[in-house]
Amino acid sequence: AVAQNADVVIIDTAGRLHNKINLMNELTKVKRVMQKVVADAPHDVLLVLDGSTGQNAFEQAKQFTAATEVTSLAVTKLDGTAKGGVVIGISDQFQIPVKYIGIGEGIEDLQVFNKYEFVDSFFK
């Protein structure tokens, strides 16, 4: 990224399950390597949670926050029966703001999180 003069680097950790210790250790190593190049990296760590996983999302948030210091959340799959209520507890317990929600599969379905609309959706 430095050689390319890139301002933004996106690292997709798809497949890094919180219960796979070796993969989580690799994620921690990626963070350390980045900090050798840019001392205060990473600047933003977005944890994407599946809104249909329920209470398992708490453990995911705990493990990923310990490994990478998550700075914001996105919750996906809120277009089905999942309401994603667990995200309220995660945001509160770990003091991580929710930035985005996913309500479908298209790019237009990734929306900026609105807390008022989110709460209203529980009563519809």
Feature names for model-found ranges:
Residues 1-124:
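P-loop/Walker A NTP-binding module and the surrounding RecA-like catalytic core of P-loop NTPases
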